Amino acid sequence: MTKYTFKPKDFKAFNVEGLDARMEALNEYIRPQLHELGEYFSDFFTSQTGETFYPHVAKHARRSVNPPKDTWVAFATNKRGYKMLPHFQIGMFEDQLFVMFGIMHEAKDKATRAKVFERKFKAIQQLPDDYRVCLDHMKPDKPFIKDLTDDDLKEAIQRAINVKKGEFFIARAITPQDKRLKSDKAFIAFLEETFDQFLPFYSA
């Protein structure tokens, strides 16, 4: 029995038609692991940063018609919410598991907070080759950093700083069949390795 990881069939919850039926599938196949990951990594971030982190598992409570295309657990230092703060995420679309750190368009003091990515521009470029950026958390698209020109990357960061709807995340994504999802041990190691790369951007 695995506690934290996801099997390829779990991702098929996103193929279930209808809001109620999909929510039922998410509750059965995905949310239990998200809650477990929430407990594990809120302790991880608290120990790594010295600040108290809280897990926020997506509830999708505002939805009345369209079923969610993704779901996640987010980590932030506010018990009541995460969107207003820089935060970490573990989440899923139908075809990927993603891990991210960054700032949503709803963040308070977004322009100031997003400047960490401007200051640490070289560090972003020096992330390993399989690291990506996400410029819209609602969409699965996450281009590899290595495929972006300096100007592309600078423009993306400036958009997060200057445009109301702009956001910027550094990210990593794997497919449902990835070997790092085969066991809890491999999955947790992958997540810890990823968050270790993200943490300098949080503490900067």
Curated annotation (Swiss-Prot):
Instruction: Output the InterPro entries linked to this UniProt entry.
Output: UPF0637, UPF0637_domain_sf
Classify the source by domain of life.
Bacteria
* Cross-referenced Pfam families: DUF1054
Family from the record: Belongs to the UPF0637 family.
Enumerate the HAMAP family for this protein: UPF0637
Designated name of the protein = UPF0637 protein SAB0972c
What organism does the UniProt record list as the source? Staphylococcus aureus (strain bovine RF122 / ET3-1)
Its taxonomic placement starts with: Bacteria, Bacillati, Bacillota, Bacilli, Bacillales
